[in-house]
Amino acid sequence: MSATIIDGKVIADQIKDEVRQQTDRLKRERGITPGLAFILVGEDPASQVYVRSKGKACDEMGFHSVTERLGSSVTQEELLHIIARFNTDAAIHGILVQLPLPPHIKENTIIEAIDYRKDVDGFHPINVGKLVIGQDCLRPCTPAGVQELLVRSGNDPSGKHVVVVGRSNIVGKPIMNILMQKQKGANAVVTIAHTGTRDIASFTRQADIVIAAIGKPEAITGDMLKPGCVVIDVGINRIQDPTAKNGSRIVGDVHFASAVKVAKAITPVPGGVGKMTIAMLMKNTVRAAEGNVYR
């Protein structure tokens, strides 16, 4: 058996096309241009790359975007003041503070300061709570992207046993809450395994769908999978490889070479879930601009 490759770029492009259509309609019918504000603190190279990628996506969608670049010495109060300004700016419909933040700034305080109606990352406690109880909200981008990958690739999770490996607030927990909802594209039986789970393989071998988000390179191997399962690899890890051009390469949380021989379908890294995260950010932003989520 050799798994079908689930191409995240193809599915992300489908979603972006839909967002462009929504954006054109908003501009034409209501005179609204979706606006997204990025706040970047410090000089972390990875964060700078992420913000540039997101800004480029905004341009492709026809959004208005602004980037506030702050030094790593910025105080928490100064950052809160900037967030408050964007909260009241009618031209800004989404606010994204790029994480991680410097140690002297409390991430939870910053996240909670964002108007939940502009929280396009889906991290605000109000949005987390609404997600848990099944109310409409702006959902975290990566978990929402995982659901879209499953549904649009013909691997609807309804009635399936899904094992999520990882319990982070950003990925693991929200994926669980999304896939167990009583709604189309969900209705799954969800098990979470994590670093405290004694025998992860005993759970993953039972799964129809395995979602790996544990943050450990190639931790899920082919012998840990049930033949014919679907594997979604959320991990992004850089490992040393002397044969690679730059001495390193990017891998996921799944050992692709062994898993591809067992699974029915699998996402690659790169080229899988990562493409979906930005697409779902664009979708959240246009939904926030439409103003229908919290009516």
Model segments located where?
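Rossmann-fold NAD(P)-binding glycine/threonine-rich loop
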Residues: E107-H124, V128, G235-Y294
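Glycine-rich phosphate/diphosphate-binding loop of Rossmann-like nucleotide-binding domains
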Residues: V41-G55, C137-V230, V234, A244-V260
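Positively charged, low-complexity intrinsically disordered leader regions
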Residues: M1-R30
